[in-house]
Amino acid sequence: FNKIKKNIPEPFAIDNKRLAISKKELFYLEPINLIMIFYISHFTNIEIHPKTLRYITDCTKLIKKSLINNKQVNSIFYDLLTSSDDPSKTLRLMNEANVLGRFIPEFQKVVGLIQYDMYHYYTVDEHTIFTIANVHLVKNGFFKNVSSFATEAILKIKSFKPLMVAMFLHDIAKGQHGDHSANGAQIAKKICPRLRLNSDDTELISWLVLNHLLLSKTAFRYDLTDKKIIDKCADVIQSKERL
């Protein structure tokens, strides 16, 4: 990525220390750049020029089925979403520019969606992005004084990238009829292959989405001194990695 930083690829350029594009028509020629610009911005830590952001917002209608199913674009988005450096700032910017919901149409349904429950202080889209940010805060030891166990545990996770995809998808079925966890698990099975994930990772992500409320429901609704409750929970989880 240092090479990217030194040699910003065309049609991008640096304008007043910010990533820019000279004409919005250039997005019409290569719509892939509507995703690529966020990728470059994230991995070079160069902010996108406000004028270019307006161009992007004006051009989101170019994000059509052909771009959504483009292998290269999906690889770019996957690398951004699962970056070892917290991508939440970039994802939030993509969301504000209406790029995120256009590229992941299933996500568009939760943009601005309000939930009246104990888990959501924010709209579902913002809650999702905060969740991703918090995972990185845990990983980087921000909460170590509060819970050193969480920091130690997350550093042992082998499937960190699938975890980040699951974080992005965990509430994607909110606002739909039925159980949002079960519906979300089915949506995950459709989105994951699009992001070039293999069958094992797809199954893991779908399982995480399906069971993302298991621990909180068990902790808040059942007697944790009852061995049967703990055994039942353990039977669902099956492994330390999934836990």
Task: Report each predicted region and the residues it spans.
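Non-catalytic interface/linker regions that flank or bridge core catalytic/transmembrane domains
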Residues: 1-120, 189
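Conserved alpha/beta core surface patches that mediate binding of polyanionic ligands
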Residues: 2-5, 143-153
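Intrinsically disordered or highly flexible coil/loop and linker segments, enriched in small
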Residues: 43-51, 62-65, 83-90, 99-104, ...
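A short linear-motif detector with a strong N-terminal bias
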Residues: 109-110, 142-146, 186, 225
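Divalent metal-dependent catalytic cores for phosphoryl transfer on phosphate-bearing substrates
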Residues: 114, 123-124, 150-243
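Short beta-strand-centered segments that line the small-molecule binding cleft or hinge
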Residues: 127
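Phosphate-handling DNA/RNA-contact segment within nucleic-acid enzymes
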Residues: 134
